[in-house]
Amino acid sequence: MDDQIVIHHDQNVSVDEIRERLENGAGALIIRGAYQDLALLDSVSDAFSERIQGEGNHAADHFASGSNQRLWNALNKLAEDAPHLFAEYYGNEWLHRVSEAWLGPLYQITAQVNVVVPGGAPQTGHRDYHLGFYPESLVAEMPDLIRRASSKLTLQGAIIHCDVPVEMGPTKLLLGSQNDSDGYLTYRRPEEQERFEREFSQVPFKKGDLVFFNPSIFHAAGGNKTSNPRLVNLLQISSALAKPMEHLDFPALVRFVYPHLLNNTDRNLVSRAIRAMVDAYPFPSNLDLDPPSDDWLGELETTWLLKAWEKKTSPSEVLSDYTNRRNRRVYRSA
């Protein structure tokens, strides 16, 4: 199965091949060694763990019960707690390459850390956001066109923070099931759950791997049968044409991270990090205050912030300009 889904970080793989594997192939990819700096992952893991302990709760898992821990909005929270780590972590080249291959240049990253404790329960097999979260009765009301479009608007991913052997519960995948035409309607049914448990595949993960899969593939996180916790940062990467699951505080991301970008000279890395920091799409907006420009779309926030970085614009000036830009997009009744 490795040759169907595994790509090594130093392989030269085309955009078309990435897209084909996710759409018509196995439906999943593992990028071995996508993060070469394992000390970076350790530092980010420490930041996540401190935040989880500080919040003192065990956030719910949509598809599993028990004492597993969740850290919602791990993107904003890393910017708040360890902004010096943000660019290297969320600006990873493979994260950008696969996201752009599936969604194009306008995409939005959200992230939720999942810690599966020893003995932690597995998830039930499911499809993911958007329609994977809808009850069957509502999915049945959706036109077939929308069901097919749902999986094209999101990419699921995970940054692997520790070695995950099979007994620790790497993601269970029903390879090729992303093309089951009625999957969003049927995945909860007992016969489909039985099929999933009978036919799923698992591949061990290594610390530093990146995992991606089509959101409509039938999948589930496995149970942790070891004595060590499993820490993975789950990524939901959305097309700018769709609504992501989480709300992001973009001004806070700029406020915390931009000063650290000024110390970085790697333009490609900075450009990728900026994709994770600001709104990927200029709509919705208040067209009275923010009227269409000659090119209709106007200047994207990603373009604006990269120009500011190139000019070494001060953090205070950037934040003031950004606040004004955001305010122009909001309609307020008199």
Residue spans of the language-model regions?
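Non-heme Fe(II)-dependent double-stranded beta-helix
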Residues: 1-136
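A short secondary-structure junction signal
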Residues: 121-127, 134-137, 167-174, 182-186, ...
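Acidic, His- and aromatic-enriched active-site or binding-groove loops in soluble protein domains
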Residues: 127-151
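Double-stranded beta-helix
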Residues: 141, 150-220, 241
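A short hydrophobic beta-strand segment most commonly corresponding to one strand
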Residues: 175, 227-243
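Glycine-rich phosphate/pyrophosphate-binding beta-alpha loops
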Residues: 218-225, 229
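Active-site-adjacent segment of 2-oxoglutarate/Fe(II) JmjC oxygenases
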Residues: 236-286
